């Protein structure tokens, strides 16, 4: 990153295609924060956190505050409350795509919910970024890549949740699987590339490559 780790008091976005290693990278950051004596929270909007895997990466799962909210509003309210308490060092939101607004969950099929999630993210980030900075808490938002429909020029990929996160994030990390690692005929892991796409704290566009071994992490 060029600054010796993830910045405190800032928003970090880790994004990439499915199964690219985003959550693994975030859990390693949690483990490092805990090792340094920090308190960590994991807001599991995907309802997919595997405590055994997290423990293998060095996460103290007993000390990790885990919340599995039902709606996007609830997830962001919990985050705001935890950050506002001032006792947290790092919080991970997995993932932005799973922060579904209440109206969408309770609404009828076929109702138009265009822009609801983007508005929810924009309002929440406006409020939360100030608090993160005051309390020196690092927030990691994990985000999925989607294909934009009908794009002929430029990248057809886009992240979910509107433009707010792109704007408010101090660091954005693009994580991709570039190769499957094999031992004989068995797949044992993935070679992964992380590119710093935006960095307000140091020059961006640095690239790191590392291996993620199944069941063990980086």
Swiss-Prot record:
Key words, A-Z: ATP-binding, Cytoplasm, DNA damage, DNA recombination, DNA repair, DNA-binding, Nucleotide-binding, SOS response
Keyword Nucleus: no
Subcellular location: Cytoplasm
A GO biological-process term: SOS response
GO terms for MF: ATP binding; ATP hydrolysis activity; ATP-dependent DNA damage sensor activity; single-stranded DNA binding
Residues binding ATP: 16-23
Any one Gene Ontology cellular component term annotated for this protein: cytosol
Pfam families from the UniProt entry: RecA
Cited PROSITE patterns: RECA_1, RECA_2, RECA_3
Functional description taken from the UniProt entry: Can catalyze the hydrolysis of ATP in the presence of single-stranded DNA, the ATP-dependent uptake of single-stranded DNA by duplex DNA, and the ATP-dependent hybridization of homologous single-stranded DNAs. It interacts with LexA causing its activation and leading to its autocatalytic cleavage.
Family recorded in the similarity comment: Belongs to the RecA family.
PANTHER family xrefs: MITOCHONDRIAL DNA REPAIR PROTEIN RECA HOMOLOG-RELATED, RECA
Name of this chain's protein: Protein RecA
Organism: Paenarthrobacter aurescens (Arthrobacter aurescens)
Lineage: Bacteria, Bacillati, Actinomycetota, Actinomycetes, Micrococcales
